[in-house]
Amino acid sequence: MADPITNPATPTAVFGKQAVTEALSDHAAILGLKDLIVDAKWDRKELTLTVAPETIVAAMQAAKSAGYNFFEDVTAVDWYPSEPRFQISYSLLSHSLKQRIRIVAHISGDSPSIDSVTSVWPASNFYEREIFDLFGVHFSGHPRLTRIMMPDNWEGHPLRKDYPVEGYR
């Protein structure tokens, strides 16, 4: 049987909750994350781990402790009108393990919020500000969550799918 993490039998292998621990058992670097993982997916030679939004800081700390020493970026996707509406994706790299992982959290609502990971990854500062500015996602505990691209008096968040094409008037 092919190892689903390092050599999946199919280009896209998706694991349900019950199979997550089993599928990750040979992937020692991320074992510290196994109790936080809601779902795992292997696609295009990259592992994507889904965690509950309230565990994002713990997941980032566990990944860092596991050897993922480089924060590449964090980005958002608005899946409007679906719920949960927003997907926040963190990309991490381990130079020693020569591996990348993506850690994803899904958040709902018109006033979405998730904890800031700046305490673990200071490099996330401007990325979180950009997501706040363009999507309206609030990062609790962020040291300076202010607009970074749009003028301070700008109304709304232009990358939300429900943002009017003509802008607010």
PLM features per residue range, with description:
Residues M1-R169:
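Terminal low-complexity/charged segments
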